[in-house]
A protein has these predicted regions:
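Flexible loop and strand-edge segments within Gram-negative outer membrane beta-barrel domains
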Residues: 56-62, 72-84, 90-149, 154-180, ...
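Membrane-embedded beta-strand positions of outer-membrane beta-barrel proteins
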Residues: 19-23, 49-51, 87-89, 101-103, ...
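Residues on the lipid-exposed face of transmembrane beta-strands in outer-membrane beta-barrel proteins
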Residues: 6, 33-39, 87-91, 134-140, ...
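Structural signature of Gram-negative outer-membrane beta-barrels, strongest in the C-terminal barrel
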Residues: 193-203, 207, 211-264
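N-terminal periplasmic accessory domains that precede
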Residues: 1-22, 31-36
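Transmembrane beta-strands of outer-membrane beta-barrel pores
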Residues: 23-27, 53-57, 105-109, 154-158, ...
């Protein structure tokens, strides 16, 4: 099982805050400043904020060979600009239960240089990406035998592709896609005796997809996952088993609605 957790602020020597600023640079207009701030808001509360920016021209040189003709060219439409920010709040309650809250944002705009075509250096394809999510996790240990963990998350993804060319109607092609996800999860861990662990988890998802394509179904999907897990360890012997129940239903604004799916 892979478990990844955000790094929590660590304050040493009685400090209540920590700041870090970094700037990196390189060829072809590359520059990447970033900042980090850790702040202690109270005896049981900490905050971390990270932000960064990246830009580059990307117009690197290359040699183009066309029979006996050799020319020195530069890559066009290779620029990129990205912005990224993240904030995390960590709190420990008096009963030792914990609450972690995260908010994350990413935005980028970049050119797509395309293929190298003789006598036609034109490249005007552009791509924009945006991602935002916020999530919260609560964990409480009631006793050495019982532990509860609950999570909630909202995730938003958006991208836009645009190309300008005479081959398109009105001289431009624009594609826009947006996906959103709403997620809830709760899990209970029970350890009745040493070496034996029983857990029950329930996950629920709502996923939406919207595009500007004509007659797009723009589906909405509802998903439910229920998992019962048992694990036993005795010395070097490890036994585990999992039972998962899945239910998925969908709605569409155009076209045929898929059948519900159930699996155990």
């Amino acid at each position: 099982v892979l478990s990844i957790e955000t790094e929590k602020p660590v304050f040493e020597n009685g400090k209540s805050s920590l700041s870090q600023i970094q700037i990196r640079g390189g060829a072809f207009g590359y520059i990447a400043p970033s900042i980090r701030r850790w702040q202690k808001l109270g005896e049981h509360t900490g905050l971390s904020v990270d932000a960064s920016f990246i830009r580059a021209d990307g117009n690197y040189p290359f040699t183009l060979e066309n029979g006996k003709y050799i020319t020195q060219e530069k890559r066009n439409n290779s620029d990129i600009h990205t912005w990224q920010g993240e904030a995390n709040l960590f709190h420990t309650f008096h009963d030792e239960s914990t609450l972690d809250v995260k908010a994350y944002y990413f935005y980028s705009e970049r050119g797509l240089p395309g293929a190298v075509i003789l006598y036609n250096p034109k490249a005007e394809e552009r791509l924009w990406d945006e991602n935002f999510f916020t999530q919260a996790r609560y964990k409480k240990t009631f006793s050495p035998k019982w532990t509860l963990q609950a999570q909630a998350k909202f995730n938003h993804s958006w991208n836009k592709y645009e190309d300008t060319d005479v081959k398109y109607e009105n001289g431009k092609q624009t594609d826009i896609n947006r996906q959103d996800e709403y997620y809830l999860s709760a899990a209970v861990l029970y350890q009745p005796v040493k070496g034996l662990e029983l857990s029950l988890a329930q996950d629920g998802f709502i996923n939406t997809l919207h595009t500007n394509i004509n007659d797009s179904p723009n589906p909405v999907r509802y998903s439910s996952l229920t998992a019962l897990n048992a694990r036993y360890q005795w010395g070097r012997i490890k036994l585990s088993g999992t039972l998962v129940g899945t239910f998925i239903t969908e709605e569409v604004k155009a076209g045929n609605t898929p059948d519900d799916r159930k699996r155990l």
